[in-house]
Curated annotation (Swiss-Prot):
UniProt family annotation: Belongs to the chaperonin (HSP60) family.
Protein name, as recorded: Chaperonin GroEL
Alphabetized CDD domains for the sequence: GroEL (cd03344)
Predominant cellular place of this UniProt entry's protein: cytoplasm
A molecular-function term among this protein's GO annotations: ATP binding
Subcellular localization(s) per the UniProt record: Cytoplasm
Amino acid sequence: MAKDIKFSENARRSLLKGVDKLADTVKTTIGPKGRNVVLEQSYGNPDITNDGVTIAKSIELKDRYENMGAKLVAEAAQKTNDIAGDGTTTATVLTQAIAREGMKNVTAGANPVGIRRGIEKATKAAVDELHKISHKVESKDQIANVAAVSSASKEIGALIADAMEKVGHDGVITIEDSRGINTELSVVEGMQFDRGYLSQYMVTDNDKMEADLDNPYILITDKKISNIQDILPLLQEIVQQGKSLLIIADDITGEALPTLVLNKIRGTFNVVAVKAPGFGDRRKAQLQDIAALTGGTVITEDLGLELKDTKIDQLGQARRITVTKDSTTIVGGAGSKEAIDERVDTIRKQIEDSTSDFDKKKLQERLAKLTGGVAVIHVGAATETELKERRYRIEDALNSTRAAVDEGYVAGGGTALVNVEKAVREVKGETTDEQTGINIVLRALSAPVRQIAENAGKDGSVILDKLEHQENEIGYNAATDKWENMVDAGIIDPTKVTRTALQNAASIAALLLTTEAVVAEIPEPKQAAPQGGAGAPMGM
């Protein structure tokens, strides 16, 4: 296919137009008074959301050059979401601010490479200062505050704090749709291990790239499955029952994996395959843990069992299983309390007898998985549209809370980014262009505060001017229209979210500034369909 190429100023201007179109859409959602965005769906009702990454991913622009600019900003949002789980709107606002200022200076004749170096220096100084002013998460109230700010709901904040209290900061918390209108929390038997699906064609939710199995059977084995004939009688029985299947095996190779994938795509039955967790003897022990939890039997030569002889009653079961590319979460295993308790007692005795700190640590991890359970947040709402929007907010809040536990928290509402300006001002560029890059980041740091104020109906410049004359952590609370200590008021952001948003924004914006050519495909004209000739007159 033929290509069209734009150079220098023309290329950057086209990219910036795309940046602006996406950012102007996303930034209306930032802050407690942020608006919602309605997204058209290819089928069904439209989505109403204020989730930055969801909006960014849904935008496709007609102009190919503008679309490339939009996709670069969406990448900053997506990377921030992948690392920190939230902060996508902040990343978008910062990317636009740095890119806009940078483009002005490059157009005026500044060297983009020098500007990029300045941006990188300023970003490092800002990130270092963020870590210095960060607070550790030490109480349930602080967890609730982080979640409440992210979701704009004290009710959701309290729910997530309760969930973390019940299963621990490192515990497994999942989100499910409720059949009622209330959002509730429950703790069920379950565990999570760090193995994901063997093929992306096994996913059932393409937006989240997850595979969800309801009331599935679970085949647990330490063997390799390479010949589909070994498990064919078992598969046929499962298909007849209309059930889904999770296969946990040493590996699935040869014709077995493509055969399973083909049957999944054709809709014969819902199947997901994952590799068994752990290695060596630890792998066998972990498989026994999963078997105890789900009421299954490990198909292993150690017990004289063969795959071809496996019966349905040797399979485990669970209420729900969610598999991502990196992990598998089992919720509501069908194992008996007696079997689980017996397994727990065995592990506790092994911990007492172990003389190796490393072995003890691994045994304690297994014990925690068997005894900790899984916290399930059942999301309720009156309508399907409201349910989706509420679920997005709870997912963001949960991710924010985990980020705060990892790296602590800073004053929210964009206040922390303005507070680090002093540290950035102390950074001096070696050249005029480097200094220009530093100044660009300095101006961009105030962009989130400006936008939060404007979304609340205030003049962003007036709010910013007043904020820059306040002590650290004193900021503008857009929710109450008051000036107060943001940390004391519970308006806090995870340090990891703020840091990641700034780093990704600076990285993508710097790439935009140093772009000298953009290559796009020229769409081939659609050939007109041949017109049919006039038919012969019908005889009488």
